[in-house]
Amino acid sequence: MRLEKGMKIKDTLKIMCPGTQLREGLENILRAKTGGLIVIGDNKEVMDTVDGGFTLNSDYSPSYVYELAKMDGAIVISEDLKKIVCANAQLIPDPSIITHETGTRHRTAHRIAKQTNNIVIAISQRRNIITVYKGDIKYVLRDSSVILARANQAIQTLEKYVSVLERVINNLNLLEFQDLTTLFDVVTAIQRTEMVMRIVEEINMYILELGNEGRLISMQLNELVKHIERDGILLIRDYCKEDFEYNEVYEQIQKLSAAELLDLDAIARLLGHTGDPLVDTLISAKGYRILGKVPRIPSTVIENLIKEFRELNSVIEADLDELDIVEGIGEARAKAIKDGLKRIREQILLNKKI
């Protein structure tokens, strides 16, 4: 599984992406060029900063928010976004809280967000932008057309990276069946997989921001990267040293900086191959990835096969009787494994994706 990065901002964006009632209200204020200051949450910390205004406790509606924003004061909305608690309120945050914002509205929003850890939205009257604050986080909501253009550009980049990854994996598949895999081939495949997954993360952020307008991008993304992460994890499992936990190795690879990811030796070290020459070190796959592509073979049987034979090549060379004695494998399943591996090999030789 991917490490969860920027969860605070992701959770915040979910409640105000296009298609939501809150976003509709924000867009109305933006178009009216009135500006506005909205606080999400009516807990004690927030209400202690509120001075004046009038209490409403009215049901939330985008048109109500738009009308109330015509007044100078802030609007406080309940945590569940169902009630407008009060309007035209003056917010008085702790003046000692440091902020580098310049406008009065944005300085107040930043301080309130830091002081209460609630979501505060400042809508600029002159610059016509929506800025979201939560704790120390500041995020400027972009127009859907801008995000859509960037998302489409990212999808095009992803297509090229996936194409390169497929070539690298096809080459690795061929070498695995010939038992000629080098450490260089393995770390290159892992590097390329991680590069693809980082672009996927970026596109997922765009999809989150686009809300219901990001459906087509989401469909394209799912089609492009169906099993890439799963195969990448199995690749790490195939080649990391016995005493290494493959999920921990995957987490460490995700934590590599962009510059470190370009260093193949750094990836090799994480797999447990410190100081080994990449091109000259022959390395055999355990077989989790390839055996996982054989139809109707449970993961427990794959585990038993690898425990018995240690390497993929030994499984490939084993005859039916040798396969039959492995726990969980009868005559029918032994034949299915042999036939499945034969079909996979033929597909690889025809340079087809498996």
From Swiss-Prot:
Q: Which residues bind ATP?
A: 73, 91, 104-108
Matching PROSITE patterns, A to Z?
Answer: DAC
Q: What class of enzyme is it?
A: transferase
Q: Which Pfam families match?
A: DAC (PF02457), DisA-linker (PF10635)
What this protein needs as a cofactor is:
Mg(2+)
One annotated GO biological process: DNA repair
As recorded in UniProt, its EC number(s) are 2.7.7.85
Protein keywords: ATP-binding, DNA damage, DNA repair, DNA-binding, Magnesium, Nucleotide-binding, Nucleotidyltransferase, Transferase
Transmembrane helix as a keyword of this entry, yes or no, is no
Which residues constitute the signal peptide according to the record? none
Q: Which residues form the DAC domain?
A: 6-144
The catalytic activity, as recorded, is: 2 ATP = 3',3'-c-di-AMP + 2 diphosphate
User: Would you say which domain of life the source belongs to?
Assistant: Bacteria
Q: Does the keyword Coiled coil apply?
A: no
- GO MF annotations for this entry? adenylate cyclase activity; ATP binding; diadenylate cyclase activity; DNA binding
Q: Which InterPro entries match?
A: DisA, DisA_sf, DNA_integrity_DisA_N_sf, DNA_integrity_scan_DisA_link, DNA_integrity_scan_DisA_N, DNA_integrity_scanning_protein, RuvA_2-like
Question: In UniProt terms, what function does this protein have?
Answer: Participates in a DNA-damage check-point that is active prior to asymmetric division when DNA is damaged. DisA forms globular foci that rapidly scan along the chromosomes during sporulation, searching for lesions. When a lesion is present, DisA pauses at the lesion site. This triggers a cellular response that culminates in a temporary block in sporulation initiation. Also has diadenylate cyclase activity, catalyzing the condensation of 2 ATP molecules into cyclic di-AMP (c-di-AMP). c-di-AMP acts as a signaling molecule that couples DNA integrity with progression of sporulation. The rise in c-di-AMP level generated by DisA while scanning the chromosome, operates as a positive signal that advances sporulation; upon encountering a lesion, the DisA focus arrests at the damaged site and halts c-di-AMP synthesis.
Per UniProt, subunit arrangement is: Homooctamer.
Similarity-based family: Belongs to the DisA family.
Name of protein = DNA integrity scanning protein DisA
The protein's organism comes out as Clostridium botulinum (strain Alaska E43 / Type E3)
